[in-house]
Regions:
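Well-ordered beta-strand positions enriched in small/hydrophobic/aromatic, beta-favoring residues
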Residues: 153, 221-223, 320, 346, ...
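Conserved N-terminal alpha-helix of the aminotransferase class I/II PLP-enzyme fold
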Residues: 41-90, 115-123
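Conserved PLP-enzyme active-site core in the AAT-like
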Residues: 2-3, 20, 83-314
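Short hydrophobic/aromatic beta-strand micro-patches
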Residues: 224, 347-349, 409-411
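Active-site beta-loop-alpha junctions enriched in small/polar residues
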Residues: 158, 187-189, 325, 351, ...
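Conserved small-domain helix->loop->beta segment predominantly found in fold-type I
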Residues: 274-277, 281-283, 288-292, 297-299, ...
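PLP-dependent enzyme catalytic core of the Aspartate aminotransferase-like
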Residues: 2, 121-122, 130, 148, ...
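N-terminal "arm"/small-domain region of PLP-dependent enzymes with the aminotransferase-like
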Residues: 2-63, 71-72
Length: 429
């Protein structure tokens, strides 16, 4: 499909399997439920292991079902290559571990998903990797946070849980001026609404569990290589990609894989050694979700904007944190980066405190109380006591998470039913 520029809705259905399955003529992508692959002869096996011949070696590294999924997400994001792994957390961890090691430093946004925040501030810190957490939209603070040993700037298109909007272009300009790549988590944005690589991001990560899968059935993560960062021009800073790798007889991934060096090294080294592989079945299920991504996201956004309008006028909801509102500090960025709308995951403040927030949540009937977002079903949770509960009071305040904060993930049910459910729950507090 490379000879013609197709629209998103077409790409999400066809990339990676432009022709029927060559063995069975099946139109649907088969589930290749196998652990390993037969080599034609000993030379063929040696060439595969030596990276001289691209192809399947072992199920921990590659799988044909997985390969279609990777190619499709990469195409939708405008990247050169993709790598699917077992979860979104694995995708974030591997992307950072690929260039960070003891003695290095990361600058990260202060509005991250709680799991990513803990990974950066606690887990990576135990490995000798220091961090500075800042409002990355404050470019002066971002500049001040960058140190000689800073290897990456990390942010999300929409912050979690408040859906703050990241100024990707401005942040990328600062990072690149310091010869540092920008990694962006586009889970909440989705490639249907925004493609961070087009705005200057170098690497994009996803929890495919969320919008890509869309139905709350399968875990998965994806890393997309934009192919835009020149690792060899910064070889001393990024030796894992631009200098000989001793575990591959001195191969240099920037030479062996070219623009796809970033994800190739993760697959060949980190995934090989640590094994957070996605199963063929999960890759298949996530492909089914991907094929309807545009349709679902349109409905998510349409419903969310109507809910925002309703709640912003309700006397028991003193605050709605959504960038579509003219009074939101990121409203101008929202208009710039999301001309077709976005942000079906956001927070509200319930009048009162934790008691009232819990009463509201427990009174909802359509909304499910669970630790996920971006499902076709509407979801709700209390971040202060769940998803962000490991944070200190200072960290919670920095992210504007209070005992009265409630996170909503608006699904694709009929909008009247969603609003009626919110109304009856608010009536009970």
């Amino acid at each position: 499909m490379a000879t013609k520029k197709y629209h998103f809705e077409t790409l999400q259905l066809h990339v990676g399997q432009e022709q029927p399955d060559p063995t069975t003529d099946a139109r649907a992508v088969p589930i290749y439920q196998t652990t390993s692959y037969v080599f034609r002869n000993s030379q063929h096996a040696a060439d595969r292991f030596g990276l001289r011949d691209a192809g399947n070696i072992y199920g921990r590294l590659t799988n044909p079902t997985q390969g279609v999924f990777e190619d499709r997400v990469a195409a939708l994001e405008g990247g050169v290559a993709g790598l699917a792994v077992a979860s979104g957390a694995a995708a974030v961890t591997y992307a950072l571990q690929n260039i960070l090691s003891q003695g290095d430093h990361i600058v990260a946004a202060d509005n991250l998903y709680g799991g990513s925040f803990n990974l950066i501030t606690h887990t990576l810190a135990t490995q000798g990797i220091t961090n500075t957490i800042v409002n990355v939209n404050n470019l002066e603070a971002l500049e001040a946070a960058i140190q000689p040993n800073t290897k990456v700037v990390y942010a999300e298109t929409f912050g979690n849980p408040n859906s703050d909007v990241t100024d990707i272009e401005a942040i990328a300009e600062v990072a690149h001026r310091h010869n540092i790549p920008l990694i962006v988590d586009n889970t909440f944005g989705t490639p249907y609404l925004i493609r961070p690589i087009e705005h200057g991001a170098d690497i994009v990560v996803h929890s495919a569990t969320k919008f890509i899968g869309g139905h709350g059935t399968s875990l998965g993560g994806v890393i997309v290589d934009g192919g835009t960062f020149d690792w060899k021009a910064n070889a001393d800073k990024f030796p894992t990609l631009a200098k000989p790798d001793p575990s591959y007889h001195g191969a240099i991934f920037a030479d062996v894989a070219g623009k796809a060096a970033f994800v190739t090294r993760i697959r060949a080294v980190i995934l090989r050694d640590t094994g957070a592989a996605i199963s063929p079945f999960n890759a298949f299920i996530l492909l089914q979700g991907l094929e309807t991504l545009s349709l679902r996201v349109e409905r998510h956004v349409e419903n969310a904007l109507k809910v925002v309008d309703y709640l912003s006028k309700h006397p028991k909801v003193p605050k709605v944190n959504h960038p579509s509102l003219p009074g939101h500090p990121d409203h101008a960025l929202y208009q710039k980066y999301f001309p077709n709308g976005g942000g079906s995951i956001f927070t509200i403040e319930i009048k009162g405190g934790e008691k009232e927030a819990w009463k509201f949540i427990d009174s909802l009937e359509i909304f499910s109380l669970l630790a996920n977002v971006a499902d076709v079903k509407s979801l709700v949770i209390h971040p202060y006591t769940t998803t962000h509960s490991q944070m200190t009071p200072e960290e919670l305040a920095q992210q504007h998470i209070t005992p009265s904060t409630v996170r909503l993930s608006i699904g694709i049910e009929h909008i009247d039913d969603i609003i009626d459910d919110l109304a009856q729950a608010l009536d009970k507090i």
